[in-house]
Amino acid sequence: MNFSIFLFLIGILGFVLNRKNIILMLISIEIMLLAITFLILISSFNFDDILGQTFAIYIITIAGAESAIGLGILVAYYRLRGSISIQYK
């Protein structure tokens, strides 16, 4: 349980510190999502519940789709702008 909280905090820290790089922001979001999935998985093992394990598989599937859509949007953004860094004004 402490490991998943630690991973979630690393994801938040990575998201906050890397506000100009979209790829690192996407990786940080994935780390946070996988930390939550790991916490759900640990809880389902502790309570001997198969529903939590099924839910974890569902979350991992959605995370894969989210990554594919995010990278597709990133490629379109790169083609439009020529750079993937975010400009704050």
Curated annotation (Swiss-Prot):
Q: Which residues form a coiled coil?
A: none
Q: What biological process terms from GO does the record include?
A: ATP synthesis coupled electron transport
Tell me which GO cellular component terms the UniProt record holds. mitochondrial membrane; NADH dehydrogenase complex
Similarity remark: Belongs to the complex I subunit 4L family.
Report the Pfam families cross-referenced here.
Answer: Oxidored_q2
Q: What is its EC number?
A: 7.1.1.2
The record's section on NCBIfam families has: PRK05715.1-2
Q: What does this protein do?
A: Core subunit of the mitochondrial membrane respiratory chain NADH dehydrogenase (Complex I) that is believed to belong to the minimal assembly required for catalysis. Complex I functions in the transfer of electrons from NADH to the respiratory chain. The immediate electron acceptor for the enzyme is believed to be ubiquinone.
Instruction: Indicate where this protein resides in the cell.
Output: Mitochondrion membrane
Report the catalytic activity.
a ubiquinone + NADH + 5 H(+)(in) = a ubiquinol + NAD(+) + 4 H(+)(out)
Q: Which UniProt keywords apply?
A: Electron transport, Membrane, Mitochondrion, NAD, Respiratory chain, Translocase, Transmembrane, Transmembrane helix, Transport, Ubiquinone
Name the principal localization, coarsely classed.
mitochondrion
Q: Where are the transmembrane segments?
A: 1-21, 22-42, 55-75
State the organism named in the record.
Answer: Talaromyces marneffei (Penicillium marneffei)
Judging by the UniProt lineage, the source's domain of life is Eukaryota
Task: Establish whether keyword DNA repair is in the entry.
Answer: no
Annotated protein name in UniProt: NADH-ubiquinone oxidoreductase chain 4L
Its membrane topology: Multi-pass membrane protein
The protein's GO terms of the molecular function aspect are: NADH dehydrogenase (ubiquinone) activity
